[in-house]
Design a protein with these regions (language model features):
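Charge-dense, helix-prone N-terminal extensions
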Residues: 1-118
Length: 118
C-alpha cells in the first residue's frame, strides 16, 4: 500500500524526464529511469536512491531517515517524509539528485513498466 498523493507528486516531478517508467516494487510504487531504480513511494514515505556521494549528507536532513525496509539499513537509499520537506525547491532538488544518480547507470533494455505520462 502506498500514498497516491505522494505518487502523483512524483509523477508530476518526473513527467518531463526521458525514460521514466513506474512499476510496483516492495509493496509500493517504484519509478525507474531506463530500468534503473530512481525513487518510489512506500506507505507514506518517498524512497530516494541517493548514491554513495550524497547518502551521508541526505541523512543529516530533518526530513530523511535510513531505508530499513527489511529491518536492516540499505545504504544509498533513504526515506523522505514529504511533509517535513520545507519547500518545493528542496523537493525538486531531491528529485533532481535521484534522477541524476539513476541516470548514471547503463540503460537496461527492454524497459518495462508503465510510462509516466508527460
Amino acid at each position: 500500500m502506498y500514498s497516491e498523493r505522494l505518487a502523483d507528486r512524483l509523477r508530476r516531478a518526473l513527467q518531463a524526464v526521458e525514460g521514466v517508467t513506474e512499476k510496483t516494487l516492495f509493496g509500493g510504487l517504484a519509478f525507474l529511469v531506463y530500468g534503473n531504480l530512481c525513487c518510489g513511494v512506500i506507505g507514506d514515505a518517498i524512497l530516494v536512491r541517493t548514491g554513495p556521494d550524497f547518502y551521508d549528507a541526505a541523512l543529516q536532513e530533518p526530513y530523511a531517515r535510513p531505508m530499513d525496509f527489511t529491518g536492516r539499513v540499505l545504504r544509498n537509499f533513504v526515506y523522505v517524509d514529504l511533509d517535513a520537506v520545507p519547500t518545493d525547491e528542496v523537493f525538486h532538488e531531491i528529485v533532481t539528485r535521484t534522477v541524476s544518480y539513476a541516470s548514471s547507470f547503463p540503460r537496461k533494455t527492454p524497459v518495462t513498466g508503465r510510462r509516466v505520462a508527460g
